Amino acid sequence: MKRICSVYKSPRKNEMYLYVDKREALSRVPEALLVPFGAPQHVFDLLLTPERQLAREDVAKVLENIEKQGFHLQMPPGEEEYIEHLPEELLRMNDPL
């Protein structure tokens, strides 16, 4: 299955994104989600195929969610993910001697 998607970012939550079918835009996104998400800011459009890889999401799950519910919500990474990627010298900066 191929689908041209529009990706929107949240102005309220860093690294939170909405994937929607470009033709439907935000028409199937519930108002209850848009309130905490904030006014969606269009980032880019892309062609999603099962072969395509996304940095932090499973493309099959994204396509399935868009088909079933009209959108896919990408949550920000957890704090643990940020910490795991910090260089060791930054992790030790505030350690007591």
From Swiss-Prot:
Pfam families: YcgL. Residues 3-87 form the YcgL domain. It comes from the Bacteria. InterPro entries: YcgL-like_sf (IPR038068), YcgL_dom (IPR027354). HAMAP family: UPF0745 (MF_01866). This is YcgL domain-containing protein PSPA7_4096. The lineage of its organism: Bacteria, Pseudomonadati, Pseudomonadota, Gammaproteobacteria, Pseudomonadales.
